[in-house]
């Protein structure tokens, strides 16, 4: 006997991302590129370089996952339909008369809708990455987690490499050194879908896809509505770090080291001051002897 919940989640898991959800993903990615300083001028001066940057933003996750699976990073170019669709979005965003696309995108309801639809595609990418990794390495759950994460959030890593080549790279923007909230939540999703695939998580695939997508969309829209980017996994990370590595003890140890470093310097300064204070007394004694 099938229940309405199963029908809903199963129908949701069979939803096609083409074309509407893919359009939303390309639109949000290209608009993020356009909002960079100097991106519009660079598009007019060198359209080919701007187009390549846009393709990296749109297909960065697929490129990185292909490289991890020893496939050609140019494999995404074989999907001509998606390339033409992403190129069309790039063209109308940068070269539309009177900048009508950017003006329309400036309305918050449109931004909420596009951002929510983009998060839906993130779930499909994670699931696709986990499935592709399993086809190459059977039940290799570490590989499945890494490839699923790369497919879902690898675009940020690829665009960081692009910024490095252009000379715009900054250490605080590197996803390897400081992972953003979307990358962390994508990694968490990749772990859950991998465990579900290996039957270590007792939940059906379509139910997990539905629940995880609802969670992503809710968090993203809430962050945009409240304009609060402080939604992080810090409490969970702190708890896990204390359990595994004893972070609190490490902080106490480092603070005690700092105190011990300060003490010799203070003693040294005091001794030097005493020496400087002793010099005038010695000079005064010599001066007194000369007077005698």
Swiss-Prot record:
Topological domain ranges for the Cytoplasmic compartment: 35-47, 101-103, 159-178, 226-292
Q: What is the membrane topology listed in the Swiss-Prot or TrEMBL record?
A: Multi-pass membrane protein
Transmembrane helix as a keyword?
yes
Q: Where is this region: Disordered?
A: 248-292
Q: What is the activity-regulation note?
A: Channel activity is activated by increased cytosolic Ca(2+) levels and blocked by luminal high Ca(2+) levels.
Residue ranges that the UniProt entry lists as topological domain Lumenal: 1-16, 70-82, 123-140, 196-206
Query: In which residue ranges is the amino acid composition biased (Low complexity)?
Result: 265-274
Family assignment from sequence similarity = Belongs to the TMEM38 family.
Q: What is this protein called?
A: Trimeric intracellular cation channel type B
Taxonomic source organism: Mus musculus
Q: Lineage of this protein's species? A: Eukaryota, Metazoa, Chordata, Craniata, Vertebrata
The encoding gene? Tmem38b
